[in-house]
Amino acid sequence: VETTAEHILDAVERLVCIEGTRKLTIDAVAAEAGMSKGGVLYNFRSKQELLLGVIRRVVTEVRERTYALSDKLTEQGVACPILRASFQIYKEYREKTAPKALFALAAQEPELVAEFQDMSTEFGRAISSEISDPVLGHMCLLIIDGLYYRQALDIEHCSAGEIDELIDRVLEISSQNSRHAVLNAEAGN
């Protein structure tokens, strides 16, 4: 069951995707959410709190889902679990407004995205630690970032199927170069 605060944040995401943050007002959020201005202000006292609420919600959800999936993949003995989880979360988010909202916020309100930057750095380190080749690890990070940015900017010209093929190929190459695979190969020699 969606809470009132979540309903308001959904409205903020939609508005930020359409109008950006500069035209975002409490009145506009209230209208988009179908509630009174007082109802919005009861949950969020300012535009800044609304924007931070969107960022925190996305960061929390992505972090929790990525680590939960990574833990499950680790239990299954799958190579590069954080990388695989990151691509899976991308697939789940590619039709949602959250990445577009985050991109708009980063462009217009860069001081608000520190939590997102921290999460990105955290995932980057985790992915890099899974892959034995540092250049390949960096390539994987750039591919993930590029997929999100292209989606957020609506400039993706590849179909979902083509992107899935790209992701499968990256995961295949990464798995062959995972620290787990390298350790197993060395143990076999």
Report residues per predicted region:
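Helix-turn-helix
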Residues: 7, 15-49
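Short alpha-helical scaffolding segments that buttress acidic/His motifs in well-ordered protein cores
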Residues: 86-90, 99-106, 140-147
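Solvent-exposed, amphipathic alpha-helical segments
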Residues: 11-18, 65-68, 143-150
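Hydrophobic alpha-helical connector segments
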Residues: 53, 60-99
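Conserved, surface-exposed functional patches that form binding/active-site neighborhoods
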Residues: 91-98, 106-109, 113-117
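Hydrophobic/aromatic-rich alpha-helical bundle segments in the mid-to-C-terminal region
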Residues: 111-117, 121-189
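Generic hydrophobic, amphipathic alpha-helix propensity
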Residues: 4-15, 29, 54-58, 62
